[in-house]
UniProtKB/Swiss-Prot annotation:
Role of this protein: Catalyzes the transfer of an acyl group from acyl-phosphate (acyl-PO(4)) to glycerol-3-phosphate (G3P) to form lysophosphatidic acid (LPA). This enzyme utilizes acyl-phosphate as fatty acyl donor, but not acyl-CoA or acyl-ACP.
NCBIfam families per record: glycerol-3-phosphate 1-O-acyltransferase PlsY
Chain segments annotated as transmembrane: 6-26, 61-81, 99-119, 135-155, 159-179, 199-219
Family: Belongs to the PlsY family.
PANTHER family: GLYCEROL-3-PHOSPHATE ACYLTRANSFERASE-RELATED (PTHR30309:SF0), INNER MEMBRANE PROTEIN YGIH (PTHR30309)
MF-aspect GO terms: acyl-phosphate glycerol-3-phosphate acyltransferase activity
Cross-referenced SMART domains: G3P_acyltransf
Protein name: Glycerol-3-phosphate acyltransferase
EC number(s) stated in the UniProt entry for this protein: 2.3.1.275
Reaction(s) catalysed (UniProt annotation): an acyl phosphate + sn-glycerol 3-phosphate = a 1-acyl-sn-glycero-3-phosphate + phosphate
InterPro entries membership: G3P_acylTferase_PlsY
Subcellular localization, as worded in the UniProt entry: Cell membrane
Species this protein is from: Mycoplasma pneumoniae (strain ATCC 29342 / M129 / Subtype 1)
Gene Ontology biological process terms in this record: phospholipid biosynthetic process
Amino acid sequence: MNAASAIALLIVFSLVIGYLMGSVMFADVFGKILNKDVRKLGSKNPGATNSIRVFGLKIGFLVGLCDALKGFLAFVFSFLIFSFWLQQYLNVNQYQKVYYLTYLSCFAATIGHIFPLYFKFKGGKAIATTGGSLLAISLWWFVICLVLWLLVTLITKYVSLASLVTFFILAIIILVPWLDYLYFFKPNPINAISYQNDWYIILFFVLWYWPLTIAVFWLHRKNIHRLLNKTENKVTQLN
């Protein structure tokens, strides 16, 4: 196999694995088990917040955790395929130019959650799945966003507002060099560290994340309307 074929397979596997894993809607899975249709109850959104409304705090938290894990594990599977199979067909220079393409699985997982194959392309808002993806990409991104999301939620009691603020801030954070600590990789064998400020990698994440941010704001348009009218449900009103 030549390098071009290996790179093509990396892209295809990353996108397919990510999308198929992202398409698993755990709110619907638990709904089948508990005989409750989350799409007909509460806000009718198959996500973690509405799952708390419909199933209770414990199951809702479990739904959110599973949604986050699929974003993380999609990357892990892509990473394993790259590391144990496709990487051997690349020289050092080629490796340093394409290793980040494994993160396409994270992008595909969020798309799968929003447009799930198994549920007629009607999904959720991809907040938890994006969180799991951030954990796979950069610990700094993940920690900053988690702390920010928790602070806004605790202060305002609005989960939707916390999600929107976090996505907006992350859209800025990804432009900051050295914060994208790609800790799964060590592309520089001399420094043995994954901090980098390569413009094309930053551009790669921008081209993925900025359209996703626009999509998330669009998916929250009803929440934004309720926030402006002060009729949005607070976390104290979930149960």
